[in-house]
From Swiss-Prot:
GO cellular component, one term: cytosol
Reaction it catalyzes: O-phospho-L-seryl-[protein] + H2O = L-seryl-[protein] + phosphate; O-phospho-L-threonyl-[protein] + H2O = L-threonyl-[protein] + phosphate
Transmembrane segments: none
Family of this protein: Belongs to the PPP phosphatase family. PP-5 (PP-T) subfamily.
Lineage per the UniProt record: Eukaryota, Discoba, Euglenozoa, Kinetoplastea, Metakinetoplastina
Entry's free-text remark on domains: The TPR repeats mediate protein-protein interactions with substrate proteins, but also autoinhibit PPT1 phosphatase activity.
Principal localisation: cytoplasm
Protein name: Serine/threonine-protein phosphatase T
Cofactor(s) this protein requires: Mg(2+); Mn(2+)
Active site: H279 (proton donor/acceptor)
Molecular function (Gene Ontology), one example: phosphatase activity
CDD domains xref list: MPP_PP5_C (cd07417)
Amino acid sequence: MAGVEEADKLKQLGNAAFSERKWHLAIDMYTKAIELTKTPTLFCNRALAELRAELPGAALADADAALGIEPTFAKAYYHKASAYLSLGKHKQALTNYKKVVDLAPQNSDAQAKVEFCKKEIRRINFENAIMTPDEAPLSQTIKLGSVRADYDGPRIENETVTVEFVEAMKEHFRLEKLIDRHDVIFILLEVQKILKKCPNFVSINVPVGEEITVCGDTHGQYYDLLNIFKLNGNPLETNRYLFNGDFVDRGSYSFENIMTLFAYKVLYPDHFFLSRGNHEGVSMNRMYGFEGEVTQKYNSEMFRLFTEVFNSLPIGHIINNEVFVVHGGLYSSDKVTLDDLQHPNRFRDIPESGLICESLWSDPQPMPGRAPSKRGVSCLSFGPDVTETFLNNNNLKLLVRSHEVKDEGYEIEHGGKCITVFSAPNYCDQMGNKGAFIRFTGGDMKPRFTTFTHVPHPGKRPMHYATGFGLF
């Protein structure tokens, strides 16, 4: 009986942490309660916290655990469906939302989710049906068109992206104004030409005494991107930047965010670098806002062109043959070499397994070895011994990755060999975290950290353009 009472106290602490949006603390409290007594409610509470913490794989496992105790527990099916939906797996989500409706016919939210999933499945099937394998890439057939007669914003002159244009474009975006379709397409086609020439993993040379800044996820938080440049200086040939993926989704200024980054890549192709993140892919863009945003601001054809450009992004970078920078992390095999990473075909949507998937989706863990990913994808989390082995085998000194919110904007793990950097402060307008970036100087290559807080942005809330939300 004492165990049950203690579990209830821990559950209440978990509920309190959840109400304060402290998802990981809530997970810890529910876990301690589950160690004392296993109930479907506790497993479902933890599943919901895991969904909020973007750990749908863990949420699926907890929903199944709840159903193992009580096979008709409707809330478990609901969380299971929500986890599948967050992964873009609409058919599996539909199956589980139907279970909820069967068990709770009056649940109007589940009924709405059933209809949403059916609609998305029809839409995706239609889009797949009209695409043919032999169809020429859109980048080869799209027309620039003429500039609108009533357009009075900044223009690309003489087919050249200049500093003056980029600065004017940034200010235009800051005022919530869009640039003409002609110039969007021009930038996308130009940046694609540059990216397609890159290997999967790009080597960056920073001369002795010069610097490079590494930023993590920015997730459509355009006004925070402007603040990074205010704090750290605009990109220049003498002020290098590397943005480590997840430029879009969630934040509702993803178009402005990615266009600014792409314009700088065109302006400084050898001094400004971009890595692909797990959100530079179709399934995430459909769920988390970028498709809806681009379609509303321009049209569906423009989104297709963005998708093609995303498929050209490099997977990672190596700075001065010392620092390995990739969005997610390391691999399911200790034998992976830098040469191995250059071989997979990256010019496609993000695969569900293999080296590219692992590069973009994996996470570090404190314990040695490997464990299944809590994100619900076919990759593993990796321990300090895995990091040590990879770095030693490839004559590297440090892993820098992103992909996870950190309260201080960064976290040093694995005995100083693994650093996570996240550059979207107050993520989704609710997490209260700081953002951070890292500066490295050629020569000593020791990381120096800058943290910063969020700045105000106009009225569009995160997920404004997303479909299927609130999911949970």
